[in-house]
């Protein structure tokens, strides 16, 4: 457990140096407890990788670990690409980023990230690798580096940003913020709790009586939407649509009926457009048909925002500004997959979007800078949205680091689905399970079958243990129980 020490503010990072001296990649194969259908993909099994770096931070040596699943059909959306190729492509960008980072020296973690980001971007452009995919690799190195820096100085993430330990400068990412300190644009304290915004996947059963005997799961966790609402006290939801108006209408009416019947009256939801539309005009027509359905009239009063309705190939076309301008009473629409580079959010705001999502796989410093930019625009009278979205995050590392950044950014409604599509930490070694329960009592609880599962009470996740950690697990993860894989790009 990290023993946080009081720190004077601000820290002077001049003369400081950060260097990555060693790294490794480990892997474990996981299976979902039920199929996760999102967009054009259905996830049933998936690799999880752990990236560990050893860093010299101002003369002190520390390690940091990051982790993520390798999800098909998200970083790239090529229907015909085999899953094996997509996994190989994801491993390629991770290996490339680590190769770029090894031996690299920066004045701070932020400075080193900037160097790595530019190198990875140059390589990606010359190799025709999409930036969203390329910087997945950057983000894994970045996360491990941030944890190492925080651990070397006994600071939690929020402290490390506001004290200047990480060297973060929002104006270096978004020039409009020049001269504004991150501490003046971010919450003064991390959130103690967040709302778990439950993913309603395209194929998820809505009621227990819809589950056939063959599909019924006997692992002590809820399976259908009504069971999840009762078990977790859920109040926030993320509902996926597929672009077919008749299917979406019937699905939304069924989802709405289930939520209204079982959830508290202060429920709220977002819609995920899953990149199903090619223009704002076509999405607006779809939206109007949904909105004009009498059975959904009161339900839509609880809408938070709409996420990425347009395909990434067209979503940031400047010509869309005219379509946005012609729709003054539009709901808040944000980007997600289109938020691929440092320039994506400013471009989206200029077109007419209300904001973006944060996912750790898109980058930590980028996400913090985006939060600062949105707060700047909010103070100038604009309605802005930064949402917290999930890419099936599970422990023992990924979901904790994800929650740490959400708490720091003050994002109160956070999509969570890793606990729903995976059976807690049941697939991990017993020692890893023990360490999680020891370090994160309150975040995890023991399931009736004896393994840790995310604790959600009254729809909320308690972040008390998360906010005490150096952006990580709070213990030294034993990587020897996982398979080490080569760092070579060959």
Which residues make up each language-model segment?
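Glycine-rich beta-alpha junction loops
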Residues: 57, 69-70, 200, 362, ...
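Short, Gly/Pro- and small/polar-rich lid/capping loops
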Residues: 4-52
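Metal- or metallocofactor-binding catalytic centers and their adjacent structured scaffolds
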Residues: 61-164
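Short beta-strand elements
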Residues: 47-57, 62-68
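Solvent-exposed alpha-helices and their adjacent loops that cap or buttress functional pockets
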Residues: 42-44, 186-190, 325-327
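Flexible C-terminal active-site loop/helix
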Residues: 10, 380-382, 388-490
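Active-site-facing alpha/beta catalytic cores
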Residues: 122-286, 301-312
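Catalytic core of soluble alpha/beta enzymes
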Residues: 238-399
